[in-house]
Amino acid sequence: MPTIQQLVRKGREVLVEKSKSPALDSCPQRRGVCVRVYTTTPKKPNSAMRKVARVRLTNSKEVNSYIPGEGHNLQEHSIVLVRGGRVKDLPGVRYHIVRGTLDTAGVAGRTQRRSKYGAKRPKAGQAAAPAKGKGKK
């Protein structure tokens, strides 16, 4: 516990809040160009081939960003919209690409949680396609 005189001399140090997505420069999203599109493996104990893109943002910073959903149409020089949000089992991936905007297509055949994957609403007359792996053998 400091004395009053010590506080007068030095004062309390203010804690600075650190951003979890510093490359966005306090913006909700940023536009960018894909520099490299590749797959990588997650940390233990998970196993998969996660789709990731290296993106150069409009503020000339480069970030690794995750491509959510099944399948994508991204390649080098694709224009994408990047938002914050890390992927827990991929070290160094602190951003997500927004599906269904700019050059990024929405996830095809998606019927639930469509807004998160940029999928359009299916036509009312069409029967829902059977879900993968749920059919009878």
Swiss-Prot record:
- Extract the Pfam families matched here: Ribosom_S12_S23
Cellular component terms per the entry's GO annotation: small ribosomal subunit
Q: Which GO terms describe its molecular function?
A: rRNA binding; structural constituent of ribosome; tRNA binding
Gene Ontology biological process terms in this record: translation
PTM annotation (3-methylthioaspartic acid): residues: 89
Q: Which domain of life is it from?
A: Bacteria
Regions of biased composition (Basic residues) lie at: 111-123
Enumerate composition-biased segments (Low complexity).
124-137
Keyword Lipid metabolism part of the UniProt annotation: no
Which keywords does the record carry?
A: Methylation, Ribonucleoprotein, Ribosomal protein, RNA-binding, rRNA-binding, tRNA-binding
Renumbered to this chain, region (Disordered) spans 105-137
Instruction: Write down the Gene3D superfamilies for this protein, in alphabetical order.
Output: Nucleic acid-binding proteins
User: Per its UniProt record, what InterPro entries does this chain match?
Assistant: NA-bd_OB-fold, Ribosomal_uS12, Ribosomal_uS12_bac
Q: Which family does it belong to?
A: Belongs to the universal ribosomal protein uS12 family.
Q: What does this protein do?
A: With S4 and S5 plays an important role in translational accuracy. Interacts with and stabilizes bases of the 16S rRNA that are involved in tRNA selection in the A site and with the mRNA backbone. Located at the interface of the 30S and 50S subunits, it traverses the body of the 30S subunit contacting proteins on the other side and probably holding the rRNA structure together. The combined cluster of proteins S8, S12 and S17 appears to hold together the shoulder and platform of the 30S subunit.
Q: How does it assemble?
A: Part of the 30S ribosomal subunit. Contacts proteins S8 and S17. May interact with IF1 in the 30S initiation complex.
NCBIfam families from the UniProt entry: rpsL_bact (TIGR00981)
Q: What is this protein called?
A: Small ribosomal subunit protein uS12
Q: Which gene encodes it?
A: rpsL
